[in-house]
Amino acid sequence: MKNEINMSDVWKWAKDLFPLNRSLTGIGNLETLKYLKDIDNNLSIKYFSSGKKVFDWTVPDEWSVKSAYLLDSKGKKLCDFGVNNLHLVGYSIGIKTTMDLSELKAYLHYDKNNPDAIPYRTSYYKRRWGFCISYNDYKKLIPGEYKVFIDATHFSGKMHYGELLIPGDEPSEILLSTYICHPSMANNELSGPLVSIALARHIKSNKVLRRYSYRILFLPETIGAISYIHKHQSILESNVIAGYVLTCVGDDREYSYLPSKYGDTLADKAVRSVIRFIDPNYKKYTFLQRGSEERHYH
């Protein structure tokens, strides 16, 4: 494994991983983790079994989708999952039916504020189906009957995740957590896993950074962190002295920082000591504006 960070490598990783259909579970997640393991062989690929109780949550069934699309009355294929996996609402059930456009519209999702974009929708914990379409394409739908085809199944399987431990001079750990459950979306969330695996390479090449140990997690959002905490709570409480959630770190906007619930932890102090030099105009949120794994690690 090369230890230096080469941005052309990171760009290639992003292009290779972008097409995969990631979700809470499924082959896309496993393929993503295997790809990351090829970058750093120390990454361990593990899983939680469907149906496992984790606190008051339950690990969901695994989801597999082969194809999904609509056909209009002229035989034109629309919302083709094979062209863009965002077209299918995540965790949709399988269905094969015909319905009029007036009825179909209840199952279509679009965003008027971003008329050229295909929105991202999921239904992890309620069995239903749906398609996502750009608003401009939605307006072009012709009246008549549409064939609906979704070849998807739910079954008792596995929810995979990745864990990378980098030992330091001390057993005290820095926790880095990111998530692998979004399909073809770059900033949210290929950026987090790629920055995390690149950081692992950088940490290993820099002895100055090896005072503390590092625990880097690649999880399905929410249920992944909850499951991991359920299994490793005592280890985390004993070893972790600071932690960060890496999410939406791939755009060109100002740096942003969401403080901890307490606001004065080691993690807070470390960020504040450097971010003002990197970007004096950085954006600071409040913990009340949390939206990712920081909810669970607290």
Where are these regions (language model features)?
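N-terminal hydrophobic/helix-forming segments and targeting peptides
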Residues: 1-298
